[in-house]
C-alpha cells in the first residue's frame, strides 16, 4: 500500500472529481462544449506591480461590481470564479461528517463535488418535469421539507445544464420557509436571461446568497473571476476562510476594465448577438431529429437524441466539440450545445445535418 493510500482521507477514496469540459475533452478547432463566449476582447495590463502580492479584496473591483449589481460594496466578495464561492460556503457553514447540502438535479456538478470533498452529505430533490419543454421547476414542497436537515440549498437559475430560469415565486417560497438554511441562487448566466435577478432580495432575506461570474457573458473565463453577493455578516464569515490572495493582480485589472461603461455596452451588444444566434441555431435544428429538452434562457441549447455518445464522437472526429450530458439525472442521451460565433454555428448546423442525413 502506497503512502498516499495509507494517509489519504478515507472518504476521498470514493470521490469522482468534477469532469470539466476542458478536462474531459481535448482537441478540436470549434469549442461548443463549455458555455464559453466566442468573443476575445482586448484589455491592458500594467505589469509594474507584478512583484507585489495583490490585495485580499480589491476595493475598486468590489465597488465596480457592486455598482453593476445595484448593491452596496460591503455585500460583495470577489473570488476565483464562482466555484470558489461554492467551496467557501460549504467550508464556512457545514460540519464534515455531520451536515448536508441540498441540490436539485439535473444541476451544476460542483455543488455536490465540493460538498463531498469536505465530507458533507448531499440531499437530492430533483426538479419536476412534466415532459413539456421548459417545464423543469423546483419541487418546493419537498425542498422545504428537506431543508430542516440541510445547511445550504443550491439553486441554479438560469439552470446549467437545462438552460431555463427557475420560477422566482418558487425561489422566494424556499427562502421564506427555510430561514435556518443558506439559500444560494447561482446566477452565472443571468446576463442572458429575460427573467429577473434575485439580487434585490438581499435586503429582505438574510439567508440569501447570489453567485455571479465573469466567465460567461463577460467572455472572461480565462481570468477566473467570480463574485459572491450576500449580507455583510455572511461576507465577514467567508473572509475568515478565504485564501489571503484570491485574485491575481492582472485578473483584478482586467475585471475592473470589463465593468466600465464602455465594456458593459459592448457586453450588451455581444449578448444580443449571441441570443439572436441561439434562436437561429434552434430554428435550423428543428429540421433535424434532435428534440429540444428545455427552452433556453442562456447561451446554450439542450437536445435529446438517440445516441448522444455517437453524436458527440462524430462531431469530435470532425474537430467540433459539444457536451454529452447523459450522466445527469433525467438526461439520458442528451447533449448540450454552446452558441458560438456565426461561422462556428454554421459549421455546427452543417455537421448535424450531415450526421442525420
Curated annotation (Swiss-Prot):
Annotated metabolic or biological route of this protein: Amino-acid biosynthesis; L-histidine biosynthesis; L-histidine from 5-phospho-alpha-D-ribose 1-diphosphate: step 7/9
Annotated InterPro entries: Aminotrans_II_pyridoxalP_BS, Aminotransferase_I/II_large, HisP_aminotrans, PyrdxlP-dep_Trfase, PyrdxlP-dep_Trfase_major, PyrdxlP-dep_Trfase_small
EC number(s) per entry: 2.6.1.9
CDD domains, A to Z: AAT_like
Keyword vocabulary terms for this entry: Amino-acid biosynthesis, Aminotransferase, Histidine biosynthesis, Pyridoxal phosphate, Transferase
Catalytic activity from the UniProt record: L-histidinol phosphate + 2-oxoglutarate = 3-(imidazol-4-yl)-2-oxopropyl phosphate + L-glutamate
Residues recorded with modification N6-(pyridoxal phosphate)lysine: 216
Name of the featured protein: Histidinol-phosphate aminotransferase 2
Species whose genome carries this gene: Idiomarina loihiensis (strain ATCC BAA-735 / DSM 15497 / L2-TR)
Source species taxonomy: Bacteria, Pseudomonadati, Pseudomonadota, Gammaproteobacteria, Alteromonadales
